Protein backbone atom coordinates (compact mmCIF):
# COMPACT_ATOMS: atom_id res chain seq x y z
CA UNK A 1 0.00 0.00 0.00
CA UNK A 2 1.13 3.53 -0.79
CA UNK A 3 -0.03 6.97 0.35
CA UNK A 4 0.31 9.39 -2.58
CA UNK A 5 -0.11 13.07 -3.27
CA UNK A 6 -2.52 13.10 -6.19
CA UNK A 7 -0.79 15.56 -8.50
CA UNK A 8 -1.88 13.94 -11.76
CA UNK A 9 -5.21 13.39 -13.50
CA UNK A 10 -4.98 9.70 -12.61
CA UNK A 11 -4.42 10.53 -8.95
CA UNK A 12 -7.40 12.87 -8.86
CA UNK A 13 -9.50 10.22 -10.58
CA UNK A 14 -8.53 7.84 -7.78
CA UNK A 15 -9.69 10.35 -5.16
CA UNK A 16 -12.97 10.84 -6.98
CA UNK A 17 -13.47 7.07 -7.34
CA UNK A 18 -13.17 6.52 -3.59
CA UNK A 19 -15.59 9.36 -2.86
CA UNK A 20 -18.15 8.06 -5.34
CA UNK A 21 -17.92 4.49 -4.06
CA UNK A 22 -17.81 5.18 -0.33
CA UNK A 23 -19.99 8.28 -0.05
CA UNK A 24 -22.13 9.08 -3.09
CA UNK A 25 -23.30 5.51 -3.67
CA UNK A 26 -23.50 4.38 -0.04
CA UNK A 27 -25.30 7.47 1.25
CA UNK A 28 -27.08 8.34 -2.02
CA UNK A 29 -25.41 11.72 -2.17
CA UNK A 30 -25.91 13.48 -5.53
CA UNK A 31 -22.63 14.08 -7.35
CA UNK A 32 -23.18 17.85 -7.37
CA UNK A 33 -23.36 17.74 -3.56
CA UNK A 34 -20.38 15.39 -3.05
CA UNK A 35 -18.31 17.43 -5.51
CA UNK A 36 -18.74 21.04 -4.45
CA UNK A 37 -17.18 24.47 -4.87
CA UNK A 38 -14.05 23.28 -3.04
CA UNK A 39 -13.18 20.76 -5.76
CA UNK A 40 -11.16 23.08 -7.97
CA UNK A 41 -7.96 22.78 -9.99
CA UNK A 42 -6.10 24.21 -6.93
CA UNK A 43 -7.48 21.63 -4.50
CA UNK A 44 -4.94 19.09 -3.27
CA UNK A 45 -5.76 15.40 -2.78
CA UNK A 46 -4.15 12.49 -0.96
CA UNK A 47 -4.89 8.98 -2.23
CA UNK A 48 -4.05 5.63 -0.67
CA UNK A 49 -3.61 2.85 -3.21
CA UNK A 50 -3.41 -0.89 -2.73
CA UNK A 51 -2.28 -2.99 -5.69
CA UNK A 52 -2.80 0.04 -7.94
CA UNK A 53 -6.41 0.53 -6.78
CA UNK A 54 -7.49 3.65 -4.84
CA UNK A 55 -8.78 2.78 -1.36
CA UNK A 56 -8.81 6.06 0.61
CA UNK A 57 -8.62 9.80 0.06
CA UNK A 58 -8.54 13.25 1.63
CA UNK A 59 -8.78 16.70 0.07
CA UNK A 60 -6.99 19.84 1.25
CA UNK A 61 -7.81 23.46 0.50
CA UNK A 62 -6.92 26.80 2.05
CA UNK A 63 -9.36 28.49 4.40
CA UNK A 64 -6.98 31.43 4.76
CA UNK A 65 -3.20 31.95 4.83
CA UNK A 66 -2.82 30.00 8.10
CA UNK A 67 -5.63 27.44 8.07
CA UNK A 68 -6.16 24.45 5.81
CA UNK A 69 -9.34 22.38 5.60
CA UNK A 70 -8.93 18.62 5.42
CA UNK A 71 -12.13 17.15 4.10
CA UNK A 72 -13.86 14.35 2.28
CA UNK A 73 -11.66 11.96 4.28
CA UNK A 74 -12.91 8.51 3.43
CA UNK A 75 -11.66 4.92 3.34
CA UNK A 76 -13.44 2.22 1.36
CA UNK A 77 -15.44 0.02 3.78
CA UNK A 78 -13.39 -3.13 3.29
CA UNK A 79 -10.19 -1.24 4.25
CA UNK A 80 -11.46 0.49 7.39
CA UNK A 81 -10.04 -0.07 10.90
CA UNK A 82 -6.55 -0.82 9.53
CA UNK A 83 -4.95 2.58 10.21
CA UNK A 84 -5.24 3.78 6.61
CA UNK A 85 -7.34 6.83 7.50
CA UNK A 86 -4.69 7.90 10.00
CA UNK A 87 -1.95 7.55 7.37
CA UNK A 88 -3.94 9.60 4.86
CA UNK A 89 -4.59 12.39 7.38
CA UNK A 90 -0.93 12.44 8.50
CA UNK A 91 0.26 12.79 4.89
CA UNK A 92 -2.26 15.59 4.33
CA UNK A 93 -0.97 17.36 7.45
CA UNK A 94 2.63 16.98 6.28
CA UNK A 95 1.77 18.46 2.89
CA UNK A 96 -0.17 21.30 4.56
CA UNK A 97 2.85 22.14 6.76
CA UNK A 98 5.09 22.15 3.68
CA UNK A 99 2.66 24.60 2.05
CA UNK A 100 3.00 26.93 5.07
CA UNK A 101 -0.23 26.26 6.95
CA UNK A 102 -0.11 26.29 10.75
CA UNK A 103 -3.58 25.00 11.62
CA UNK A 104 -5.53 22.05 10.26
CA UNK A 105 -9.33 22.04 10.38
CA UNK A 106 -11.75 19.14 9.92
CA UNK A 107 -15.53 19.02 10.08
CA UNK A 108 -16.24 15.67 11.71
CA UNK A 109 -19.41 13.66 12.07
CA UNK A 110 -20.06 13.16 15.77
CA UNK A 111 -19.29 9.43 15.65
CA UNK A 112 -15.85 10.14 14.11
CA UNK A 113 -14.74 12.71 16.72
CA UNK A 114 -12.71 10.13 18.71
CA UNK A 115 -10.75 9.24 15.54
CA UNK A 116 -9.64 12.86 15.09
CA UNK A 117 -9.05 13.37 18.81
CA UNK A 118 -6.62 10.44 18.70
CA UNK A 119 -4.55 12.50 16.23
CA UNK A 120 -4.59 15.66 18.34
CA UNK A 121 -7.65 17.47 17.00
CA UNK A 122 -9.83 19.38 19.46
CA UNK A 123 -13.58 19.59 18.89
CA UNK A 124 -15.54 22.79 19.26
CA UNK A 125 -18.98 21.43 20.18
CA UNK A 126 -20.36 24.97 19.85
CA UNK A 127 -19.60 24.90 16.12
CA UNK A 128 -22.23 22.49 14.85
CA UNK A 129 -22.52 22.33 11.07
CA UNK A 130 -25.82 21.12 9.64
CA UNK A 131 -24.93 19.76 6.22
CA UNK A 132 -27.19 18.37 3.52
CA UNK A 133 -26.25 14.82 4.50
CA UNK A 134 -24.57 14.86 7.92
CA UNK A 135 -24.32 16.95 11.07
CA UNK A 136 -20.68 17.74 11.78
CA UNK A 137 -18.55 19.54 14.36
CA UNK A 138 -15.52 21.70 13.67
CA UNK A 139 -12.20 20.40 14.99
CA UNK A 140 -8.76 22.02 14.86
CA UNK A 141 -5.15 21.04 15.36
CA UNK A 142 -1.94 23.07 15.41
CA UNK A 143 0.41 21.70 12.78
Region annotations inferred by a language model:
Residues 75, 81-94:
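Conserved acetyl-CoA-binding loop-helix of GNAT-fold acetyltransferases
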Residues 32-38, 126-129:
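Short, solvent-exposed loop/turn elements at beta->coil junctions and helix N-caps
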Residues 89, 96-109:
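Conserved GNAT acetyl-CoA-binding A-motif
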Residues 117-126:
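Conserved acetyl-CoA-binding loop of GNAT-fold acetyltransferases
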Residues 62-71, 80-81, 130-135:
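A conserved beta-turn-beta hairpin within the catalytic core of GNAT-like acetyltransferases
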Residues 109-110, 129-143:
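C-terminal "cap" of GNAT-fold acetyltransferases
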Residues 47, 53-61, 69-74:
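Conserved beta-strand in the GNAT
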Residues 1-33, 40, 45, 49-50:
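Short amphipathic alpha-helix that is part of the acyltransferase structural core
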Amino acid sequence: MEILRATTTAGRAGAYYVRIQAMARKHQIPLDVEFDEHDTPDTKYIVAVDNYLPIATCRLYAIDDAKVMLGRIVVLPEYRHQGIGTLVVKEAETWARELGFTTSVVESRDNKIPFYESMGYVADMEQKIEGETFTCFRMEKNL
